Amino acid sequence: MFPGSVIRKLSHSEEVFAQYEVFTSMTIQLRGVIDVDALSDAFDALLETHPVLASHLEQSSDGGWNLVADDLLHSGICVIDGTAATNGSPSGNAELRLDQSVSLLHLQLILREGGAELTLYLHHCMADGHHGAVLVDELFSRYTDAVTTGDPGPITPQPTPLSMEAVLAQRGIRKQGLSGAERFMSVMYAYEIPATETPAVLAHPGLPQAVPVTRLWLSKQQTSDLMAFGREHRLSLNAVVAAAILLTEWQLRNTPHVPIPYVYPVDLRFVLAPPVAPTEATNLLGAASYLAEIGPNTDIVDLASDIVATLRADLANGVIQQSGLHFGTAFEGTPPGLPPLVFCTDATSFPTMRTPPGLEIEDIKGQFYCSISVPLDLYSCAVYAGQLIIEHHGHIAEPGKSLEAIRSLLCTVPSEYGWIME
């Protein structure tokens, strides 16, 4: 086999995802009839529009990673007939192998009675959540056009997305002296942290494993009430959810005197000038930090307001914009001496995806796949079709415990504050 052409070298911020072979996936439950040929045409059009998605990764002689073009066509959709299931399992191999040395993008369709399950797997070095959501939306839009008109739409090949480092350099943003993590130094080794049992996680190089995930959905009414509550108190949904997660973690940890370090990504597309299109960059994220000092009388509105105030201050002084330039390519979890970190993504608002007549989206689920021996523990949030989704990813002893407590808090807060739907 002859080596392919190198498209470009992965940047520092992208290499961490290559080192741990990190893929993200979005699984969509569909009800109705699926036109497999039209979906195949839509997927081909997506790849022609974003040709870099058909590439793969190769390690370079200096230990880094290269993005390499393939001479062969992408393998296309993997279709599994789940209607011939035995013992509840679809016929064929439903476990798609994820191999970054072969492909960075996969699409799997499992046909079921009355519908299907569609999963798009995307290597994290090529796309963050915002970028990935736009690709899924484009796939469904092209599929709808292919079904209704016979044509998946115009194709204009897009350039290879830029790394975070390249985008920041274009805008004159350079590494400063502070990363934002300095606010955690005051609690480093300042408390006696109770020992917790760490689950063993076996890494299998070349075979990324699914990270367990549990999740909750709020109803449209519950989500609407929560958003109205936030507007009343001039708070974003992200801030209210973050405060609820931190209050829940404080309660479950049973260490009331120990502050909680909180870290969350900030989509810099909304911050930089000129703005950046969703698929113009790979992982265009800054890291925001907050030290939650919670007590028995801590109020969710006060906590959320302080999170927002801290974020605004860090954006104003430029810390968040350059924060990603400070971090290495090794993931080691919470640093020694620091209380366990809480990490949560911002609530991405997914567009209401187009579907042809007779096909409906019933459910959406995200998942991570990676080869890493450090146990993961993180929250992710999204809003789809007016409903808030919170997922808890990781190797956690009681995965549903925190989510149920978060649900209870988020659903009771509007009424406890006397907010009533008119």
Curated annotation (Swiss-Prot):
UniProt site (Structural role in the organization of the active site): 128
Active site, per annotation: 124 (proton acceptor)
Catalytic reaction equation(s): 2 a mycocerosyl-[mycocerosic acid synthase] + a phthiocerol = a dimycocerosyl phthiocerol + 2 holo-[mycocerosic acid synthase]; 2 a mycocerosyl-[mycocerosic acid synthase] + a phthiodiolone = a dimycocerosyl phthiodiolone + 2 holo-[mycocerosic acid synthase]; 2 a mycocerosyl-[mycocerosic acid synthase] + a phenolphthiocerol = a dimycocerosyl phenolphthiocerol + 2 holo-[mycocerosic acid synthase]; octan-1-ol + hexadecanoyl-CoA = octyl hexadecanoyl + CoA
Site positions for Important for mas ACP domain recognition: 312
EC numbers: 2.3.1.282
Keywords of this entry: Acetylation, Acyltransferase, Lipid biosynthesis, Lipid metabolism, Phosphoprotein, Transferase
Enzyme class: transferase
InterPro entries, per the entry: CAT-like_dom_sf, PapA_C
One Gene Ontology CC term in the entry: cytosol
Effect noted on mutating residue 312 to E: 40-fold decrease in affinity for acylated mas protein. No change in catalytic activity
Recorded effect of pH on activity: Optimum pH is 6.5.
Domain of life: Bacteria
Result of altering residue 234 to E: 4-fold decrease in affinity for acylated mas protein. No change in catalytic activity
Gene Ontology terms, MF aspect: acyltransferase activity, transferring groups other than amino-acyl groups; O-acyltransferase activity; transferase activity
Keyword Lipid metabolism: yes
Entry's family note: Belongs to the acyltransferase PapA5 family.
NCBIfam families registered for this protein in UniProt: PRK09294.1-2
Quaternary assembly: Monomer. Interacts directly with the acyl carrier protein (ACP) domain of the mycocerosic acid synthase (mas) protein. Interacts with FhaB.
Domain notes: Consists of two structural domains that are related to each other.
Role according to the record: Catalyzes diesterification of phthiocerol, phthiodiolone, and phenolphthiocerol with mycocerosic acids, the final step in the phthiocerol, phthiodiolone and phenolphthiocerol dimycocerosate esters (PDIM) synthesis. Can directly transfer the mycocerosate bound to the mycocerosic acid synthase (mas) onto the substrate alcohols. Is also able to catalyze acyl transfer using various nucleophiles as acceptors and several acyl-CoA thioesters as donors in vitro; preference is observed for saturated medium chain alcohols and long chain acyl-CoA thioesters.
Descriptive protein name: Phthiocerol/phthiodiolone dimycocerosyl transferase
Species of provenance: Mycobacterium tuberculosis (strain ATCC 25618 / H37Rv)
Gene of this entry: papA5
